[in-house]
C-alpha cells in the first residue's frame, strides 16, 4: 500500500482512530479543478433543429435638377439552419443600380460541425482562412481549427499562471490596479492558479500569500499581452485546404495553409505556419513575450512566388508589436511597427492577382508603418503614425 506522501509530493494524511476517519491533504496544484461556469464537453448540447435569418435593406433615390435621377437597392441576408448537429451559414447580398437587373452575390456559404474531442470546428464551403499569421484568403474548401469558445473563459485569452508554495493552510489574494481580482484558500504545498479572468493586456498582478501563522509573502507577476499569445499549456491549431475564390480573378490556385500556436510558459508563446501552393510557398516563425517591461511579439515570414510568365520573387516580411500598461500613470502604451516588407515579398493574394495579369497597386514596395497608441485612464487617446 502506497503512502500519500510517496504518491503526491507535499501530500499528507491524518487518521482519527476514535471515529475511524481518514483525512487526505493534496496540494492545490495537483487537483484537477473545473473552472466555475465551464461545462465539460461530454455534457454539451448541439441545440435544436432550427432555421434563422436576419437582413438589412436600404433604398436610395435621388432626383437631380436638369440631370435626371438615380436609384439603387441593397439587401443583405445572414441566414442559416441547425440540423442534426450540423450548422449551415450563408452571407448573401443583392445589389441593383440604374440600368441593371440586379445581382446576387454570396460572400460565405458553408457547413460546419463542432468536434468536441478536438475542441475544434470542421467547416466546408465558401469561407475565409484565418488572418492571425497570414493574410486572410477567400477560398472554397475545408477548414479545421481550434474553437477557443470551447475552452474555459480564462483560457480563451492570455493570462499568466500564478504559482507558489504555501507552507500552511493559506489565503492567496491577487490584486490588479489595487483591486482584488481573485482570492482562494489553498492547503500546504504547491499551488497553481490558472482560472484568472482579467481585462486583456491589463496591469501586472500583485500576489499575497497569508499563512495560518500570520506570516505574509508577496510578489509580482508581470501581465501584458499582444496578439498570438496564449496561456501556458494552451495550444491553437488551424488547417485550411482548397482553392482560392478571389473576386475578380479568373485564374485561381489550390493551396494548403497550416498554423500552430503554443503557450510554453508565462514568459513565452511560440507560433508559426506555412502556406503551400503551386509555385508559391511562405513560412512564418514568431514568438510572444510577457516581460516586466511589457508584452512583445516578433515574427518573420519568408515567401517564394514564381509567376506564370517565369518571374520569380523571394522576399521577407517582419512584424513587431508591443503593449504595456503603466500603473503609476494609469496609461496604456502600445507600439506596432506593422509589416515591414521587402520589395519582392508577395502574399498569396498577390501571387494569385499577378497570375491574372492585373497590376497590383503599390505592390509590396519596401515600407514601414509605425503606429503608436497612448490611452490614459481619462479616456483620452493619442495616435501617432
Model-derived regions: residue spans:
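Structured alpha-helical segments in the cores of large, soluble enzyme domains
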Residues: 75-79, 254-260, 287, 382-384
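Outer-membrane beta-barrel channel domains
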Residues: 2-233, 288-290, 299-366
